[in-house]
Amino acid sequence: MFRIAKNLVRTFEQSVQDTLALSQDSSNLDAFFQSIPPNLLSAQLESPVDAVSEGVKHTNVNETLSGLRIVWVDEMQFQLQSFFDYIVGFNDDPVPVVSNQHGFSYPDYRRITSIFNEHCGRTLKVNIWSAKGGTFRDEYISIISKESDDLDDVSLNHDERRPSSGEAHQFQALGFKVQWTPLIASTFTYHILNVNIPDGPAQSAGLIPDEDYIIGCQDGLLATGGETLLQDIVRSRANYDLVLYVYNKVSDCVRPITVHIGPDGRLGCNVGYGFLHRIPTVKHCPQQAQQQGQDDNPVPVPVPVESETAFVPSAFTAPPVPTKKKSKNKKGTQPLAMDDYFNEGRDKSSTAAKSAESDILAPPPQKQSSSD
């Protein structure tokens, strides 16, 4: 049995190592990004990223693959999520990009603006890749045209030496802001495994094991990622407060917490980093779960009060207990009372008949008295 268990563990470790090696291979696309259709990545994969810049050869596809990351959304914009969503295409076409002399790709904002201008008064299909489990989806965004009074002013002092900033926006604000960011940046997360210091900084701040993921830090200190980066930052903030941004996979929300680091420079919890500790796919939508919970526990609709027991909850599914007792008493006592009533009637009739017979037999003594 021990040998079988040892072989199973060895096989599992080998499969994990193969998966990690495949994800770290510069020539293969990371498994986290394979949900994106290949046609949306062709513009970046075919760009001259192999160009040599200052003696460094950029050949890692996973590090250079980028998208328009959502960094801010309006409170009325429910289709997109900041930090997690990346725009990787429009109308099933890749994001227009251009390459500089060093082989790096960046968005062609002039072409992107023209795409939005062409769809004024219509909906635009936006291809979204999410860092929550590496999923892909499509969203349709309504492009509202600007009023004639709201059009952008064109500067008359045009300097030919300065490049044009692009076409004028003929559409209203979209309700979100983007930044050209590598997709791999969304994997720089630290999974809370357990709390190892009672009443330590992690426990005092409310970190939840297995559910929480540290996805950011104040001043963008975790933006570059790295297995030991969080540990180094915590040590450098000994005796100071540190603001962390934590994602909870159960509630599907991000919350900021302030952790007071002690003099020992420890956070008080074990964290996991890497391929096995990335943010998983959301199992359910919080709004749908809330609606489902409301459906499971329906609130009774108020009805006019008809009796003293009308306030009992769920009266429409099961009769109230007091009503049952009263009905039992009525069923149990009324028949007995009626039986007694009829029995009493029967007894009276029989006694009356007997008394009548006794009255008929009574005359003989009267005859004797008359003879005397």
UniProtKB/Swiss-Prot annotation:
GO terms for molecular function: protein-containing complex binding. N-terminal acetylation; by N-terminal acetyltransferase NatC. Pfam families: GRASP55_65. Residues 66-292 are annotated as: GRASP. It is a peripheral membrane protein. One of its GO terms (biological process) is amyloid fibril formation. Gene3D superfamilies: 2.30.42.10. The modification N-acetylmethionine is found at residue 1. Keywords: Acetylation, Cytoplasm, ER-Golgi transport, Golgi apparatus, Membrane, Phosphoprotein, Repeat, Transport. It is found in: Cytoplasm; Golgi apparatus, cis-Golgi network membrane. The modification Phosphoserine is found at residue 155. Residues 312-372 are annotated as: Disordered. Residues 66-183, 188-276 form the PDZ GRASP-type domain. GO terms for cellular component: cis-Golgi network; cis-Golgi network membrane; COPII vesicles tethering complex; cytoplasm; cytosol; Golgi apparatus; Golgi membrane. InterPro entries: GRASP55_65, GRASP_PDZ, PDZ_sf. PANTHER family: GOLGI REASSEMBLY STACKING PROTEIN GRASP, GRASP65. Involved in the spindle assembly checkpoint. Involved in ER to Golgi vesicle-mediated transport by either facilitating USO1-dependent and -independent tethering or increasing target accuracy of fusion events of COPII-coated vesicles. Homodimer. Interacts with BUG1 (via C-terminus), probably forming a heterooligomer consisting of a GRH1 dimer and a BUG1 dimer. Interacts with COPII coat components SEC23, SEC24, SFB2 and SFB3. Present with 2730 molecules/cell in log phase SD medium. This is GRASP65 homolog protein 1. The lineage of its organism: Eukaryota, Fungi, Dikarya, Ascomycota, Saccharomycotina. The gene is GRH1.
